[in-house]
Amino acid sequence: MFRVLNNDVYSPAVVQQQTTLAFGKASSLCTDNRSANDQCEMGENFRESGQDHVKRPMNAFIVWSRERRRKVALENPQMQNSEISKQPGYEWKRLTDAGKRPFFEEAQRLLAIHQDKYPGYKYRPRRKAKRPQNSLPSVSSILCNQMSVETLHPFTYRDGCAKTTYSPMESQLSRLQSMTSSLLQKEHHSSWTSLGHNRVTMATHIFADFPFYQSLEPRLSCAYFPY
């Protein structure tokens, strides 16, 4: 009986279970200690950053607007914050020099206290982070560039004695219109029995007569010539 109990206690399954439990406790302790250390370090960094930043001393308008804004908010609880912030500015402009004098005196007193507390203080405004500009061009700019490249390469040809300048797109469209009109006229006079055969033969003859068809780009030929 005693041997059986000892075998159960020292069996491989029990030993493995005990080791996994012990390892889990140790890892949890390590993670807890790391989180505590990280929190302490973050707290120290926040304190150091808060100590480095020193607020500017208040001027006369800020001294007056702080008190006045509180009074306006208490008198008008339903007023929005944007309207509450505008109200002290309007009233400050209406005040006379005698009405502004006590607030200027209070601002001078606060400035003297600030200079005694921070003798080497210099105002350094925080710079706003610049947004990264998109280095890749937009799709609309690419399309505009392609259209300008296609339309801004004119060529000249002679028709008798006159010289005329056309862009590639204009010349191709004009020739396509003349070709389609001639096809329609010839097909109108043809018989219904030989309509399919005449369409193919006329198209091949017309395309052979015009050499510019060979210089067309694949995208234009597929778009304008479905045969």
From Swiss-Prot:
InterPro entries: HMG_box_dom, HMG_box_dom_sf, SRY, SRY-related_HMG-box_TF-like. SMART domains: HMG (SM00398). It is found in: Nucleus speckle; Cytoplasm; Nucleus. PROSITE patterns: HMG_BOX_2 (PS50118). GO terms for biological process: cell differentiation; male sex determination; sex differentiation. Coiled coil: none annotated. Residues 54-122 bind DNA. Its main location: nucleus. One of its GO terms (molecular function) is RNA polymerase II cis-regulatory region sequence-specific DNA binding. GO terms for cellular component: cytoplasm; nuclear speck; nucleus. Keywords: Activator, Calmodulin-binding, Cytoplasm, Differentiation, DNA-binding, Nucleus, Repressor, Sexual differentiation, Transcription, Transcription regulation. Pfam families: HMG_box (PF00505). Interacts with CALM, EP300, HDAC3, KPNB1, ZNF208 isoform KRAB-O, PARP1, SLC9A3R2 and WT1. The interaction with EP300 modulates its DNA-binding activity. The interaction with KPNB1 is sensitive to dissociation by Ran in the GTP-bound form. Interaction with PARP1 impaired its DNA-binding activity. Belongs to the SRY family. PANTHER family: SEX-DETERMINING REGION Y PROTEIN (PTHR10270:SF161), SOX TRANSCRIPTION FACTOR (PTHR10270). Transcriptional regulator that controls a genetic switch in male development. It is necessary and sufficient for initiating male sex determination by directing the development of supporting cell precursors (pre-Sertoli cells) as Sertoli rather than granulosa cells. Involved in different aspects of gene regulation including promoter activation or repression. Binds to the DNA consensus sequence 5'-[AT]AACAA[AT]-3'. SRY HMG box recognizes DNA by partial intercalation in the minor groove and promotes DNA bending. Also involved in pre-mRNA splicing. This is Sex-determining region Y protein. It comes from Moschus chrysogaster. The lineage of its organism: Eukaryota, Metazoa, Chordata, Craniata, Vertebrata.
